[in-house]
């Protein structure tokens, strides 16, 4: 789980990016596992977008590897009404941007790469800090039920038998 201050810093970066590129309609930071880290995606389901980003990332990574072009850096999809651009963001995350079809693609790449690097720095630093911190010891669980005090059992010499009564 990302600390609140780091989450706020990632969200600030996404909002600044949308200010620098006015044709952006959404921005999402997600883990490569498809889980949302932070988003500013009005009108788009962030969980669905993160899952689709992870799926397309898997294909892009394999394609780059199969063609001998090295590790994943970015992916651009052009649709009839706009663009979806995904950039590497550190070791374990990606930045996905949604843009109108009239966006300057060069500007989109320039700002997307910078923002991806910044988001990656924030997330990698938070991950490194989490690894340095000693793990919190879980609290001792409380018993589900308490034991009642047991009464002493009678011994064979104390118990009357059917023949003695």
PLM feature spans:
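Acidic, low-complexity cytosolic segments
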Residues: 1-24, 33-165
